[in-house]
């Protein structure tokens, strides 16, 4: 049986890869731009590729993974933030993850990723349903 493989966008300190390893999932690559979190992740996952800025990645060029996780910036989605939602400068980076997922799916004829997991603040849910439906990213029973 082939092990599931994971890619992590907006990786931070590597919480998704850490959880993945504990479930028998192999973290393959991560994208993060902050040096301190990258150093932490490199210490725990020395073999995981660090790919840098999500805005410079192309999903067609990334090693295909079964699962893509992402915790895009929440500043514009948080109740204590400016509440510009996904139109805000930082929180709109969410769409970079969607772009990368779509590119990988196109390059693999829809095989990868099979699962996308987004982590964010509770207030984000008020902004996301219409976006997910418009982008045909979530097809689930009501």
Where is each model-derived feature located?
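Conserved active-site and SAM-binding loop architecture
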Residues: 1-142
